């Protein structure tokens, strides 16, 4: 199908036989995401995406019932555990399957919705998750090195 593209100063129009799609440029500067992406890490772990996504979905069922919508991932050299909590309903604690873990032990909290969206973009593959600290953004990347794709998740500070 042919697509006609019209570009103006602050807008663009895509036209097909059955659709018109219009978008305009937002004012202001886009944040410099290069500063957010860590260049080093202290903890690294490999997961199979469908298994991790299923666990996040289960934990988020409880976290959505609470006020904060946060899950916690606890990584140690011999175990990886995902926690969800809702004061009204209860807690979930699930030991996760993982391939390789290296580096320092870590407890980090994050919004499960952002993590689920990031994981869905990868599909059926293994990813490597790299952490610098519990308060710094962490990255998700395909384990296969020929793919150049990265997701960035910002953690949530908890008490």
What are these regions (language model features)?
Residues 36-40:
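Short hinge/gating elements
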Residues 1-26, 41-159:
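DNA polymerase processivity clamps
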């Amino acid at each position: 199908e042919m697509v006609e593209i019209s570009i103006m100063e602050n807008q663009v129009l895509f036209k097909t036989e059955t659709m018109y799609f219009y978008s305009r440029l937002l004012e202001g500067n886009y944040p410099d995401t290069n500063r957010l992406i860590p260049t080093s890490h202290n903890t690294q772990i490999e997961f199979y995406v469908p298994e991790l996504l299923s666990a996040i979905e289960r934990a988020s069922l409880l976290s959505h019932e609470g006020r904060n919508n946060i899950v916690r991932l606890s990584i140690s050299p011999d175990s990886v555990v995902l926690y969800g909590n809702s004061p009204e309903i209860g807690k979930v604690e699930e030991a996760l399957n993982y391939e390789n873990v290296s580096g320092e032990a870590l407890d980090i909290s994050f919004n499960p919705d952002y993590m689920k969206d990031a994981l869905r973009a990868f599909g059926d593959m293994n990813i490597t998750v790299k952490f610098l600290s519990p308060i710094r953004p962490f990255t998700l990347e395909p384990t296969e090195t020929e793919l150049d794709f990265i997701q960035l998740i910002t953690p949530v500070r908890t008490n």
